[in-house]
From Swiss-Prot:
NCBIfam families: NuoD (TIGR01962), PRK06075.1 (NF004739), PRK07415.1 (NF005649). SUPFAM superfamilies: HydB/Nqo4-like. It comes from Zea mays. Keywords: Chloroplast, Membrane, NAD, NADP, Plastid, Plastoquinone, Quinone, Thylakoid, Translocase, Transport. This is NAD(P)H-quinone oxidoreductase subunit H, chloroplastic. It comes from the Eukaryota.
Length: 393
């Protein structure tokens, strides 16, 4: 940190990487003049695991279990972008039923992610009650996930060409019951939090970002929409079946921490609307494009017919990526999650570049906290919503 300390009474404080309010192994080197923040330098990389390099040494099917360790609170989105990239590259068609199932899972995952943002955010501000409330609803979402995927987290459910399994009997009725119950829960959150005078004192006008600044910094997700920019990839660049549903982009114009809170609460309501429509309209048919599993090459003369039929029904380990490049993106809970994929006519990607929304959104933190009070750092950092597994990759 290049900072010439002329005043003797300035203090340099390390926040993290083990501090509970850091939401992961993030370290902040903060320069203070009393309670006023003079400078802040984030130190990243404590959770770096080389995810991009690992992708270059694995086939897509082998790599799928790794991606759930990026944003481990919204794993459906990391799975979605991982299978979308080769699907777009090879022009693989997805059955309509599989696309609807994906939308349902993605929106449930969005709600779970926003819930686990809301609880710790309120705990950072000193309110413990919402932290326990959010686990009540989040547990119900994980029960729904477990019934379909067998896992509460790290689901490994998406596949190239569809999903791993169909929805079990009676699951959609349980999902609709959850939607009705959860809408009441959102009302309870708003009554408890939104008009609370202590909460408003802590968040109103804190961490202001103008619309122009948000665009120039490359922010996305609630960080961008809370500054008056109505940019949501589900509307702007629709993927899966999002153009089949009626819902509204949530945005605010104030650009402060309160606006980011309101955007996320509003998004949970809209996610429920999307889920209800998807469950009501979901078509019949297959849940996976079996053609995507077949071998591209001709039958090996050394195999007998039984071996070929048996091997051909499994997810093919020799799914080769053609010599092309493309960028795909989805609207994750924290912003635009993208993959830049370069194929090379081989099993492994030649380049697998991840665009993590949390990493880019975090870059504006030093600007936001300067000239603020020390206690406001937790408010501003919490309003950004970062997961260090995604930031460090």
């Amino acid at each position: 940190m290049s900072l010439s300390l002329k005043r003797k009474d300035l203090m340099i404080v390390n926040m993290g990487p083990q501090h509970p309010s850091m939401h992961g192994v993030l370290r902040l080197i903060v320069t203070l003049d009393g309670e006023d923040v003079i400078d802040c330098e984030p130190i990243l990389g404590y959770l770096h695991r080389g995810m991009e390099k690992i992708a270059e040494n694995r086939s897509i099917i082998q790599y799928l279990p790794y991606v759930t360790r990026w944003d481990y609170l919204a794993t459906m989105f990391t799975e979605a972008i991982t299978v979308n990239a080769p699907e777009f590259l090879e022009n693989i068609q997805i059955p309509k039923r599989a696309s609807y199932i994906r939308v349902i899972m993605l929106e449930l995952s969005r709600i779970a992610s926003h819930l686990l943002w809301l609880g710790p955010f309120m705990a950072d501000l000193g309110a413990q009650t919402p932290f326990f409330y959010i686990f009540r609803e989040r547990e119900l979402i994980y029960d729904l996930f477990e019934a379909v995927t067998g896992m509460r987290m790290m689901h490994n459910y998406f596949r190239i060409g569809g999903v791993a399994a169909d929805l079990p009997y009676g699951w959609m009725d349980k999902c609709l019951d959850f939607c009705d119950y959860f809408l009441q829960g959102v009302v309870e959150y708003q009554e408890l939090i939104t008009q609370n005078p202590i909460f408003l004192e802590r968040v109103e006008g804190v961490g202001f970002i103008s619309g122009e600044e948000a665009v120039n910094w490359g922010l996305s997700g609630p960080m961008l929409r809370a500054s008056g920019i109505q940019w949501d990839l589900r509307k702007i660049d629709p993927y899966e079946s999002y153009n089949q549903f009626d819902w509204k982009v949530q945005w605010q114009k104030e650009g402060d921490s309160l606006a980011r809170y309101l955007v996320r609460v509003g998004e949970m309501r809209e996610s429920i609307k999307i889920i209800q429509q998807a469950v009501e309209k979901i078509p019949g048919g297959p849940y996976e494009n079996l053609e995507a599993r077949r071998f591209k090459k001709a039958k090996n003369p050394e195999w007998n017919d039984f071996e070929y039929r048996f091997l051909g029904k499994k997810p093919s380990p020799n799914f080769e990526l053609s010599k092309q490049e493309l960028y795909v993106r989805v609207e994750a809970p924290k912003g635009e999650l993208g993959i830049y994929l370069v194929g090379d006519d081989s099993l492994f990607p030649w380049r697998w570049k991840i665009r993590p929304p949390g990493f880019i959104n975090l870059q504006i933190l030093p600007q936001l906290v300067k000239k603020m009070k020390l206690a406001d750092i937790m408010t501003i950092l919490g309003s950004i919503d970062i997961i260090m597994g995604e930031v460090d990759r």
